[in-house]
């Protein structure tokens, strides 16, 4: 597989030719950049991959039950497995989603779980990313271009094909579809992952729509064609954050949402993929309790461990953090994707005392 390295420049030229881009905002200015390709592969054996798959499925299963529980019965809080302040105080907890249960009870249709392999060669989970995970299209495209640039590499090695993600996503949409077409909903071309939105719409055979293409009537969601004809929508793979999904329910100033889409969702007339309110499970305070969650809901030992984590809510953890802060990475519980990260080794003594 290391034969791919000599094709790095060629693959990057192909990525540029096909316009594989992602966007970033810096100083309130939107810039598009070509997706950077690293030809050095991370080789994972089938046995190791099967182990990871089992662990990830177990974790997502427990998190899915947790999401239904906290928005309905709240049994995990009543049984004092998780302190209520970590649920209700989480930035991602949405009171507007109380009592709302999605079709087939599936909250987390897609997850973007971050893994890291330690010096001990064990795999650890860093983040769960159940809100609006992104990035699946880039390895699919990279694999396609790698095969094109170096077909002999793939003939000589048995490599599992990852290009079936579009089929898997379509199957997930079909499974929860309440009757109607599937839609990929994008906020527009200035979103950082707009390329991916259009790519996944093509690969799933779903209608690629913007918010102005959709409307709700009688608690049913419809897609309006240019001809004026309308089609009922049964499932929406939405790439719009919760706060902006519905100006009638969440942020009233949102220009990206579909008015009353939450009414259609609450009535069980449309599936939203992923379910609104999932971001509570991405909170770093909740992350701390996922191993306990797995034991509580599934009666199983966690297959994959969290990265060693200390929560200053507990006196013992607080003492450890204060004694070892310069060896630790400090994260804001409400942040994700590298935001709000502080490296203890880079802190001045004054900043340590401030924290």
Q: Where do the protein language model's features map onto the residues?
A:
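Preference for protein termini
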Residues: 1-355
């Amino acid at each position: 597989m290391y034969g791919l390295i000599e094709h790095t420049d060629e693959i990057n030229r192909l990525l540029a030719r096909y316009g594989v881009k992602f966007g970033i905002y810096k100083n309130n200015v939107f810039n598009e950049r070509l997706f950077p390709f690293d030809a050095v592969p991370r080789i994972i054996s089938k046995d190791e991959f099967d182990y990871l798959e089992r662990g990830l499925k177990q974790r997502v299963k427990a998190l899915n039950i947790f999401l239904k529980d906290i928005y309905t019965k709240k049994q995990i809080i009543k049984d004092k497995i998780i302190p209520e302040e970590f649920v209700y105080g989480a930035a991602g907890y949405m009171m507007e989603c109380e009592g709302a249960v999605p079709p087939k009870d599936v909250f987390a249709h897609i997850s973007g779980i971050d893994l890291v392999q330690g010096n001990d060669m064990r795999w650890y989970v860093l983040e769960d990313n159940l809100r609006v995970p992104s990035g699946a299209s880039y390895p699919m495209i990279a694999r396609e271009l790698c095969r094109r640039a170096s077909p002999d590499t793939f003939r000589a090695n048995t490599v599992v094909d990852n290009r079936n993600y579009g089929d898997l996503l379509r199957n997930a949409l079909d499974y929860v579809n309440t009757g109607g077409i599937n839609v990929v909903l994008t906020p527009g071309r200035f979103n950082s992952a707009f390329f991916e939105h259009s790519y996944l719409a093509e690969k799933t055979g779903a209608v690629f729509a913007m918010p102005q293409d959709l409307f709700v009537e009688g608690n049913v969601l419809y897609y309006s064609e240019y001809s004026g004809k309308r089609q009922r929508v049964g499932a929406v793979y939405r790439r719009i954050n919760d706060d902006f999904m519905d100006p009638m329910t969440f942020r009233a100033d949102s220009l990206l949402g579909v008015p009353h889409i939450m009414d259609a969702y609450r009535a069980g007339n449309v599936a939203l993929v992923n379910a609104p309110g999932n971001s509570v499970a991405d909170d770093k305070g909740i992350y701390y309790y996922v191993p306990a969650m797995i034991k509580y809901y599934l009666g199983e030992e966690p297959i994959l461990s969290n990265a060693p984590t200390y929560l200053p809510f507990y006196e013992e953890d607080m003492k450890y953090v204060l004694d070892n802060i310069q060896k630790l990475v400090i994260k804001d519980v409400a942040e994700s994707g590298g935001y709000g990260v502080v490296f203890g080794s880079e802190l001045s003594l004054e900043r340590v005392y401030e924290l």
